C-alpha cells in the first residue's frame, strides 16, 4: 500500500478547470500517478446518483487500463456496487466502524485524521489500511477543510509509533512535497497541483522525485 500512495491524485468534476475529468485523469495516469480517488463533492459537482455512477465507471475503467488503484470518497454503496479498489472517508463522513463492517476484506479502507489521537484510534481499529493526514498546508480545493496542521503533525504521528501508511493531504504541490515526505509521509495527495497545471507530466515527475528539475 505504501508504494501506491506515492502520488495520490484526488479529483471530481468540480475540480476540473480545463477539459473533462476523464481527460485530465488519463493524462495524469500516463504521467505516473500511483492512485486515484474519485471525490465528487461541493459546488459544481454532479448531483444525481446516476451521473456520479456513470462518471465513476468511466474513471474506474481508465484506472484499470493503467493498473492504478481506484478509490471512491465517502460513498460506500457506490464503491461496493462497482467493485472499487478502495473507499476513503473523513472523520465527519460515514462512521468508520460501519464502513469497516461493510467493506473490510472487499477493498482498501482509508481514513482522514487530523491529530495523533485520531491516528492512534485508526490503528487500533485494525482494519484501516492507510490514513490521510492534514491539511498540511492551506488548500483552495476543500471549502470544509480543517485548520492547517503543518508538517509537524506527521512527525508527531511517527514519533507516537504509528505504523500505518500515511498520505499527506492539503495544499501539497511539487514545491513543498519533499517537506511532507521528509516529515514521515509515504506519499502525497494532490488536487489542484494537477487539475490546474499546464504540464502535469512535469508536476508528477517532481512529486515522485523531489528535486527533479522543473
Curated annotation (Swiss-Prot):
List of residues binding 4-amino-2-methyl-5-(diphosphooxymethyl)pyrimidine: 37-41, 73, 112, 142
Annotated cofactor note: Binds 1 Mg(2+) ion per subunit.
Catalyzed reaction equations: 2-[(2R,5Z)-2-carboxy-4-methylthiazol-5(2H)-ylidene]ethyl phosphate + 4-amino-2-methyl-5-(diphosphooxymethyl)pyrimidine + 2 H(+) = thiamine phosphate + CO2 + diphosphate; 2-(2-carboxy-4-methylthiazol-5-yl)ethyl phosphate + 4-amino-2-methyl-5-(diphosphooxymethyl)pyrimidine + 2 H(+) = thiamine phosphate + CO2 + diphosphate; 4-methyl-5-(2-phosphooxyethyl)-thiazole + 4-amino-2-methyl-5-(diphosphooxymethyl)pyrimidine + H(+) = thiamine phosphate + diphosphate
Name recorded for this polypeptide: Thiamine-phosphate synthase
Known function: Condenses 4-methyl-5-(beta-hydroxyethyl)thiazole monophosphate (THZ-P) and 2-methyl-4-amino-5-hydroxymethyl pyrimidine pyrophosphate (HMP-PP) to form thiamine monophosphate (TMP).
Record keywords: Magnesium, Metal-binding, Thiamine biosynthesis, Transferase
Residues involved in 2-[(2R,5Z)-2-carboxy-4-methylthiazol-5(2H)-ylidene]ethyl phosphate binding: 139-141, 171, 191-192
PANTHER family in the record: THIAMINE-PHOSPHATE PYROPHOSPHORYLASE (PTHR20857), THIAMINE-PHOSPHATE SYNTHASE (PTHR20857:SF15)
Organism: Listeria monocytogenes serotype 4b (strain F2365)
Enzyme Commission identifier(s): 2.5.1.3
InterPro entries: Aldolase_TIM (IPR013785), ThiamineP_synth_sf (IPR036206), ThiamineP_synth_TenI (IPR022998), TMP_synthase (IPR034291)
Primary enzyme class: transferase
Family: Belongs to the thiamine-phosphate synthase family.
GO cellular component: cytoplasm
Pathway terms, separated by semicolons: Cofactor biosynthesis; thiamine diphosphate biosynthesis; thiamine phosphate from 4-amino-2-methyl-5-diphosphomethylpyrimidine and 4-methyl-5-(2-phosphoethyl)-thiazole: step 1/1
